[in-house]
C-alpha cells in the first residue's frame, strides 16, 4: 500500500 509513502511525504 501507499501508506508508507503518505507518511514519508510529511
Curated annotation (Swiss-Prot):
One of its GO terms (biological process) is neuropeptide signaling pathway. The modification Methionine sulfoxide is found at residue 8. It comes from the Eukaryota. Occurs in three forms: Rhopr-MS has unmodified Gln-1 and Met-8, Pyro-Rhopr-MS has pyroglutamate at Gln-1 and unmodified Met-8, Pyro-ox-Rhopr-MS has pyroglutamate at Gln-1 and oxidation at Met-8. It is found in: Secreted. One of its GO terms (cellular component) is extracellular region. The modification Phenylalanine amide is found at residue 10. Transmembrane segments: none annotated. Keywords: Amidation, Neuropeptide, Oxidation, Pyrrolidone carboxylic acid, Secreted. The modification Pyrrolidone carboxylic acid is found at residue 1. Myoinhibiting neuropeptide. Belongs to the myosuppressin family. This is Myosuppressin. It comes from Rhodnius prolixus (Triatomid bug). The lineage of its organism: Eukaryota, Metazoa, Ecdysozoa, Arthropoda, Hexapoda.
